[in-house]
Amino acid sequence: MNNFQYIDKLRLTTPKATLKYPKLIEPETKFSPEGHYKVTAVIPAEDAAELADQLDALYEAHKASLKAQAPTQKFKAIEPSFGYEDINGKPCFTISVKMKAKGMDRDGRAWSASPALFDATGAPVKHRETLRGMWSGTTGRVSFEACPFFQPAIGAGITLRLKAVQ
């Protein structure tokens, strides 16, 4: 474990976005037995400027904070899971977020989690199964936490943790 002090995480919500490959009802277990929920939000560039600025500022502040705490140490910067892309000839801001579905805490107790789901009016979805038909192209908003991290073997970056989807 390292002894760095991290800057505070941010809780953010995207503007209206097109959801790409949402796995929000059942966790994706293809690459890990614990599974994880995930979604990629594709936001038109003109609507994403404020969100992009906030994420970029957090990323730069995190790198500056680590450098200030250890001026002689070199930090490998991990490519963030957000950025601008050209999709079908249109500039878009994409953001990929995920959440672990289950695991074990430090005391050995099992835990499980799932993202909160809300309908278009903001009311919680009571029957998740009714959303099973949701797939790429669905329009929604994604709430997430942007958390700075540093692992010496991996590097420094920002992880985006899924919290809720409307």
Feature locations, PLM:
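OB-fold ssDNA-binding interfaces and closely related basic DNA-contact patches used
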Residues: M1-D105
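A short linear-motif detector with a strong N-terminal bias
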Residues: A17-Y21, T72-K74, G122, T139-A146
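Beta-strand elements of well-folded, non-transmembrane domains
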Residues: I43-D47, A146-P148, Q166
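Short acidic, glycine/tyrosine-flanked loop/strand segments centered on an H-E-D-like triad
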Residues: A101-G122
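Exposed beta-sheet edge/beta-hairpin loop segments within beta-rich domains
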Residues: P115-G140, C147-I158
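Short edge-strand/loop segments of extracellular domains
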Residues: L160-Q166
